């Protein structure tokens, strides 16, 4: 960081402190800007290619799908805000509950907004349609070959399947209703097996797993319910940490990696996929343990939002070892939930787990953005990790990982040596007039700041990086440059 940049930060912090003091003396709330509208993005070895404001909606999960000769982004949204429960859809002129944005990103420099599908009523986490996964009908064993299917959540009450063969004119296929919560599901396109993060009514937790056969999306078949012993209906005693999400390696890898906990009480669970699908179904303690190979309880201070399997990796420093020179690695990402590093939450970060001995997985490395580099705890909103890309396309897989860090943007990590991960790039988007404030209490008064809140990230096979913002700023399409681009093996741009 340059001397000029340090001086700018000191001036900003001084002005911010004066503003807060004046607000408290006057007894009213204050909105301060850590970033200013018109300021350029902050970046290293990453650059902005394209942008879409997503109609000013708080965004969660982007899924990028190669659809014929087009590339389409399906982006899930949180519900609206108290101030704007129904943002306007410029395509229809109507106020609409936030749901799913469908954007043509074939030309990433000029994304085209095609359609908004409204979601469930409710603000913030209570509404919207946060999650998206997409499969081609021709890949599903019993799918309509002419169809393309979007699996999305509908608030916390349902999962929906839509035919998006014409992405500008989606058609609802079916809705799986009667749930008390939903979240970050996984769908295998080559088998149709879906691991749905749900809230079955009789379970003791908000979120658990429903395993479905969606090989024919028009005729879903429920296979079983799954969770940790003590969460199932009729159980007693302490309730274990609720589910957050999972990632399957499919029939070839025969593993499902479950992550329990968000910012506390994290658990990594390694499960035999075949035993989970074909084993005994009744959710009693023995049957819930039956498919489990290994389980790692993290510190109570950290969660397990994303459990991304990197598979077998050659460890550079072990290259001359005659035994175990390759290791089976899982990357775990926590999620920060607290604004401005306040009480009640430890620093959330990234952990690298050696799961070569699956019954005894162990943490071997970690990564965190240095807070003092830019005084992120004072910028406003959340500072800490949230989510990583989940694409296993060769362009980045086992080479670069991208992790969102809320007000610290998205960070590019060199993971070729997972025992020694290192940051090789970052991009912190600029705020706009649409960027929403985030508040904390100071002496009983609301003190609010406007800052970027990079929420989730995904990549595509072409090597583009898609970052969406929780604070309503929109979609940023990025590419890596310099040394980060060389690591990916992409041609110079």
Q: Where are the language model's segments positioned?
A:
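N-terminal secretory signal peptides that target proteins for export/translocation
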Residues: 1-14
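Bacterial N-terminal signal peptides
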Residues: 17-29
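Feature marking well-ordered beta-strand scaffolds used for ligand recognition
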Residues: 30-493
